[in-house]
Amino acid sequence: MLNRVAASCALILINSPVYAFDFSFKGMIKSEVVTSSQGVASFGGAYSQVAPTHALRTDIFGGAPATEQQTNFLESESTSFQAAQSRFSLNMNHEKIRSVLEFDFIDGEDGFTNQTALQAQEPRLRRATLYYDMDENWTFFGGQKWSTAAGIKSSGSYNWIGNAYRAGKSGFLAVEVGATYKNDGLMVTGALTGKGRNATAGGINANELGRMPGLALDVNYSFSGHKIGAAGHFAELNFEDEAGFTAGENQDATLMKVYTTLNFGAVSINAEYYTGDALNNQNALGVAPSSGLNGAGEVRESFGESGFFTYLTWKVNTDSTIKVGYASASVDSSDRNRLSLTDLNENTTAYINYGHKLMDGLTGFVQFTHFNTEYGGDFEDFSTVVGRAGVVFKF
């Protein structure tokens, strides 16, 4: 009797419409130790090893000349344990519809400054995207996703969140609606982008796109395991309608890039070059400061910049991989005289890492990264070395 009941319930569940949806749960847990030879920052201006992006000035603390003790702090070595770059995603497929909902755990709200696990590791939405595959050629999408203008998504670094940003890597996540056309090796994507006003936000979100929509484009072609492409984002920052506006004019926010992936058996090379204006107003995470209104309500003109990154991957054997990367970005020479002592003028990073498969799903790694950062005003440069070692469990 019980067997018949169980069989009947199973038959009902199998034929229930809800089970026509195919769900999968994926994720990565990264546990590591991070050490730096002296002050390193994670996107902001505080000593932080959460997601290192550049070396800190050691002669300025909190925007003022550093005291001897503050300089000692900024020049001191530091070591921390980190798990904040872990992430997971829920994926769904149903006939022609696909979706992904992805979160990671990092101190994004407070500027990547909290490093204590119980204080910092809060869920942060990364991707929330819906795709409709109309046929084998056309896909329509909407939601928060990797920017159409992101180009190459990874810099080959185990610093997934830092990802060589502010040092030659550009293009992060964006809210978009658009379409992709694929035919043989050709892929063309176009999207409308935009962000609402957010006058109270800080950091990279301080001045969001005030006029919708922006336009993002990507065209790439794949052949014989290689890929070449070009991408861009074009928008306008509408400051003239802001509540505190007193003088100035709207600013262009542009990003243009070319990129390539070349595969030669066990060795592959990724490279990208970009140029643009007001990258940090586009969530493209450039080296220059964002545009915005100053305390008097005057528009701070956008800064032009350019940069590039490249990394080489060597698949030593089925279990071991070595990656070597180099990236550099700088503010345009015509705009450098407007930089302050705490603004970045040029930032360069070089890194090498080794990953080894310990068992199915589990990889051990070690990475060394060197940052050299030149600041505005007096154009002094500062350097630091960051080491990291740990394990990644993918499920």
Across the structure, where does each feature detected by a protein language model lie?
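C-terminal closing repeat unit and adjoining cap/tail of repeat-based domains
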Residues: 353-369
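Sequence/structural signature of outer-membrane beta-barrel proteins
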Residues: 34-36, 106-113, 145-152, 156, ...
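Membrane-spanning beta-strands of outer-membrane beta-barrel proteins
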Residues: 81-83, 123, 172, 212-214, ...
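Outer-membrane beta-barrel proteins
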Residues: 73-78, 116-118, 163-167, 205-207, ...
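Outer-membrane beta-barrel "beta-signal"
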Residues: 356-361, 381-395
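Detector for outer-membrane/organellar transmembrane beta-barrel domains
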Residues: 217, 221-348
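Outer membrane beta-barrel
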Residues: 21-45, 49-51, 55-197, 209-212, ...
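Gram-negative bacterial Sec-dependent N-terminal signal peptides
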Residues: 1-20
